[in-house]
Amino acid sequence: MKIDISAIKKLRDLTGAGVGDCKEALSSCDGDIEKAKNYLREQGIAKAYKKSTKDVSDGLIAIHVDGNKGAILEVNSETDFVARNEKFQKLVLNLVSLANQYATESIEDFLKHEYISGTSVHDEIMSNIAIIGENIHLNKIGCLSVNSGVVSGYIHNPVIDNLGKIGAIVALESNGDSEKLKVLAKQIAMHIVAAKPEALSLDVLDKDLLNKEREIIKKQVDQLNKPAAVAEKIIDGRMAKFYQDVVLLDQVFVMDSQLTISELVKRKESELAETINLIGYKLFVINK
């Protein structure tokens, strides 16, 4: 049967599928657009499962903050071309909004949740794989919330608002002025993106990393042939420098070299006359 061009256009608008696929679907379904939609979905999902095994090395980081809670996630694609695709970007923004709503960091649980279209998150991703033509992989999710305070974030060099290749969210617990807290949290998020700390504080720094670094420094100092007491002081000094490199609260603030992050927070406490606790952060970098 001859397929009307307007029907092909309508089906394309509804599904995002190519002209040839739309024409084939309408021909197979006697011109019925609703049946053709289902046909495309069935055919597309079958193809999508084949594509879902392909390697992904690009993608986007997205953030969504809303008052006292926020989320950040990484969605990977095969190429930067797809990462710049408007449909892919819309999917990623919708996913991070839902991640903030559902407040789960479990990929397995999140994929089972309902997407805004009424399907599951998993099925929506598979549908987008079919339409876009590349594998799409939800790599990780990070969520933060506070009972009283703010969550804010930062994306470096965004492709559009809240989307880029590297980003961070920060949670501050305080009864202080929320607008001023948001400014502080964003400044800290910007610092995190630049300085890339390994941990919030020394007590939560990975012990294996800590022991490995101390062992490396000890071997270096042993070659100096210093007395034991002197050698120990040198080791402690170098470890202090290591902490300043990797522990957020000990890092020198990138916007003011006269302050550490801990001192920055204390200064803001004095200004607001309220206690401020930096309770957590999430830093995501594409494929890191």
UniProtKB/Swiss-Prot annotation:
Molecular function GO labels: translation elongation factor activity
Q: Which Pfam families match?
A: EF_TS (PF00889)
Q: Which residues form the signal peptide?
A: none
Keywords annotated in UniProt: Cytoplasm, Elongation factor, Protein biosynthesis
Against PROSITE patterns, the record matches this protein to: EF_TS_1 (PS01126), EF_TS_2 (PS01127)
Domain of life the protein comes from: Bacteria
Q: Where in the cell is it found?
A: Cytoplasm
Give any Gene Ontology cellular component.
Answer: cytoplasm
Q: Region annotation Involved in Mg(2+) ion dislocation from EF-Tu: residue ranges?
A: 79-82
Functionally, this protein is described as follows:
Associates with the EF-Tu.GDP complex and induces the exchange of GDP to GTP. It remains bound to the aminoacyl-tRNA.EF-Tu.GTP complex up to the GTP hydrolysis stage on the ribosome.
UniProt-listed PANTHER family:
ELONGATION FACTOR TS, ELONGATION FACTOR TS, MITOCHONDRIAL
Family that this chain belongs to? Belongs to the EF-Ts family.
Q: Which NCBIfam families match?
A: tsf (TIGR00116)
Q: Which HAMAP family match?
A: EF_Ts (MF_00050)
Protein name (record): Elongation factor Ts
State the organism named in the record: Ehrlichia canis (strain Jake)
